[in-house]
Amino acid sequence: MAWALLLLTLLTQGTGSWAQSALTQPPSASGSPGQSVTISCTGTSSDVGGYNYVSWYQQHPGKAPKLMIYEVSKRPSGVPDRFSGSKSGNTASLTVSGLQAEDEADYYCSSYAGSNNF
């Protein structure tokens, strides 16, 4: 039986001007154990497309978010290489290969947005 990787959209909050912009993620993605799933995160040339500072977070219910990918494609120590990040134009992607049951979670993207805005 397939199980879902639930996705939410993370807003980028402007810390200087208090401007706010949204990075667009699909509402959900799903796959069966062993398969691969790719999650997209679409922004603009002012955020995702303009900088190589896209991060991805995984959050299980009741737990704090965990950094999975930073600077588009870098993995922190301890994150399995089943998780990989990439970017093309204004869209960043997170691919989870060899899906495992523990991968079922919420996944958030974030991007630097310029002018001291995140």
Swiss-Prot record:
SUPFAM superfamilies assigned: Immunoglobulin
Keyword Ribosomal protein: no
Residue numbers spanned by region Framework-1: 20-44
Record keywords: Adaptive immunity, Cell membrane, Disulfide bond, Immunity, Immunoglobulin, Immunoglobulin domain, Membrane, Pyrrolidone carboxylic acid, Secreted, Signal
Signal peptide segment: 1-19
Gene it is expressed from: IGLV2-8
Disulphides: C41-C109
Protein's recorded name: Immunoglobulin lambda variable 2-8
Region (Disordered): 76-97
Molecular functions per Gene Ontology: antigen binding
Region: Complementarity-determining-2, residue numbers: 71-73
Ranges where the record places region Framework-3: 74-109
Function of the molecule: V region of the variable domain of immunoglobulin light chains that participates in the antigen recognition. Immunoglobulins, also known as antibodies, are membrane-bound or secreted glycoproteins produced by B lymphocytes. In the recognition phase of humoral immunity, the membrane-bound immunoglobulins serve as receptors which, upon binding of a specific antigen, trigger the clonal expansion and differentiation of B lymphocytes into immunoglobulins-secreting plasma cells.
Residue span(s) of domain Ig-like: 20-118
Tree of life domain: Eukaryota
Spans annotated as Framework-2: 54-70
Region: Complementarity-determining-3, residue numbers: 110-118
GO biological process: adaptive immune response; immune response
Residues modified as Pyrrolidone carboxylic acid: Q20
Segments for region (Complementarity-determining-1): 45-53
Annotated Gene Ontology cellular component terms: extracellular region; immunoglobulin complex; plasma membrane
SMART domains in the record: IG (SM00409), IGv (SM00406)
Organism, scientific name: Homo sapiens
Record carries keyword Ligase: no
